């Protein structure tokens, strides 16, 4: 049986995901899109990414790879039994294979707060307006590719204004969009 194999390298401020596709994987799930780059990274200066729970990393990997997985997605770390059971209830096309025995599940702590994938546009600004006051708006600041019409200046300015009025807006360097 073949599968997508995921490798992760990380430091305090960066997580790098590398994906190895094998024969049964779906390189082109439809005529409209295909697996682009075989790697992605997330960088931030304000959070220790080594503290991210494995279940959250696994969820991120599933969301990145889902259209392309053939029969199995192989994770390079342990996950909790609770997460594995939850995934089995949702994923039907493929299975998740993690390394070794289970780890404790992620506990929800009262000091945690909600976050919002903030684009800087009208919709995410409206969503932020109805979220709890302690919501952290997170802008996924992707690199601008050569020839692109995309201009992040307005979103950068929105984040700056949010910080000025008391929000804790974060710009996270992220190239997930180019998978």
Predicted regions and their residues:
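ATP-dependent adenylation/nucleotidyltransferase module used to activate substrates
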Residues: 7-74, 78-179
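Intrinsically disordered, low-structural-confidence terminal and linker regions
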Residues: 1-5
């Amino acid at each position: 049986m073949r599968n997508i194999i995921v490798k992760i390298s990380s430091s305090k401020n960066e997580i790098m995901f590398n994906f190895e596709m094998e024969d049964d994987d779906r390189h082109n799930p439809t005529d409209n899109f295909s697996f682009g780059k075989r790697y992605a990274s997330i960088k931030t200066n304000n959070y220790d990414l080594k503290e991210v729970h494995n279940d959250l990393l696994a969820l991120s990997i599933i969301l990145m790879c889902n259209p392309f997985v053939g029969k199995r997605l192989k994770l390079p770390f342990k996950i909790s039994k609770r997460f594995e059971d939850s995934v089995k209830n949702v994923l039907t096309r493929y299975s998740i294979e993690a390394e070794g025995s289970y780890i404790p599940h992620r506990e929800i702590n009262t000091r945690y707060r909600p976050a919002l994938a903030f684009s800087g546009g009208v919709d995410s600004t409206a969503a932020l307006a109805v979220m709890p006051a302690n919501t952290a708006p997170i802008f996924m600041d992707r690199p601008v590719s050569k020839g692109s019409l995309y201009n992040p200046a307005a979103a950068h300015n929105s984040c700056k204004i949010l910080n000025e009025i008391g929000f804790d807006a974060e710009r996270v360097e992220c190239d997930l969009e180019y998978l």
